[in-house]
């Protein structure tokens, strides 16, 4: 009830009035029944603009820390995240990953929409990074349609380190800042029912994950990087160049 009220009367009107997000492919969202929405992750505001774009409620996993802050500020933050359909998830790995999987399956089992970012964290540089196979395991076990989604230009209005999106953006080569309209592109559902019962096969999981990431890349137009985003962030933090640590492509190997 809180989600529907705040989305309809507060979050959605403000987001649509100020940023006028461009939304395509809404016809690919089923009117009823479960589906897994998989999206690239460019900015904090992805979890605002995607729920605003889709008429049905989307449940997203979020860091449990967002729901456990102290004092009035902590309560307000927790209320905000719940208002945009997010639930607390321990993302520390191991058993926590299994708990996250089970939570997603429970949501889908209720016939709802569950959203997930296969990259596991926000892109450090606007490129699309290698997907984690948990998304494939969830898709195969749940047996639901997988709907690829591309968030576009959200990193421009909501750069790393910021929480509140900017209304106008100053870009290199332009004298005056301009209004950047974020985009939400929703692709056609992917069907992985042919892999039923194969959720323990790591080769199948990687193949399904890569197919999902390819669909997202086609929608977003992003460059794909064969490295986990978490690893890329570690390299940047250490002052290293991400591209120096990428495996050479087949064409590069032949050329040398």
Residue ranges and their predicted role:
Residues 2, 98-256:
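Non-catalytic C-terminal accessory region of glycerolipid acyltransferases
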Residues 4-8:
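Residue-level signature of transmembrane alpha-helical entry/exit and packing/kink sites
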Residues 9, 21-26, 46-47, 74, ...:
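A generic local structural motif
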Residues 9-41:
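Helix-to-loop junction immediately C-terminal to a conserved catalytic motif
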Residues 10-12, 83-91, 118-122:
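Short, basic, glycine/proline-bearing loop/turn elements
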Residues 14, 80-81, 107, 139:
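A generic structural signal for well-ordered alpha-helical segments
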Residues 16-23, 96-98, 166-169:
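Short gly/ser/thr-rich secondary-structure transition/capping motifs
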Residues 29-94, 99:
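Catalytic core of membrane glycerolipid acyltransferases/transacylases, capturing the structured
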């Amino acid at each position: 009830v809180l989600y529907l009220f705040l989305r309809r009367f507060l979050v959605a009107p403000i987001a649509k009035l100020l940023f006028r997000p461009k939304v395509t492919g809404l016809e690919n969202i089923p009117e009823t029944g479960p589906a897994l929405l998989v999206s690239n992750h460019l900015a904090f505001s992805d979890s605002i603009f995607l729920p605003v774009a889709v008429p049905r409620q989307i449940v997203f996993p979020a860091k449990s820390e967002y729901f456990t802050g102290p004092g009035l500020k902590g309560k307000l933050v927790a209320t905000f995240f719940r208002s945009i359909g997010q639930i607390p998830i321990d993302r520390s790995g191991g058993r926590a990953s299994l708990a996250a999987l089970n939570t997603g399956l429970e949501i889908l089992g209720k016939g709802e929409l569950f959203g997930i970012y296969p990259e596991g964290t926000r892109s450090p540089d606007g490129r699309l990074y290698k997907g984690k196979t948990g998304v494939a395991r969830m898709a195969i076990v749940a047996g639901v349609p997988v709907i690829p989604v591309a968030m576009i230009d959200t990193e421009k209005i909501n750069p790393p380190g910021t929480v509140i999106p900017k209304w106008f953006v100053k870009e290199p080569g332009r004298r005056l800042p301009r209004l950047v309209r974020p985009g939400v592109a929703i692709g056609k559902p992917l069907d992985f029912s042919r892999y039923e019962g194969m959720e323990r096969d790591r080769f199948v999981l990687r193949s399904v994950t890569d197919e999902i990431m390819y669909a997202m890349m086609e929608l977003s137009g992003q460059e794909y990087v064969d490295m986990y985003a978490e690893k890329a962030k570690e390299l940047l933090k250490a002052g290293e160049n991400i591209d120096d640590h990428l495996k050479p492509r087949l064409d590069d190997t032949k050329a040398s």
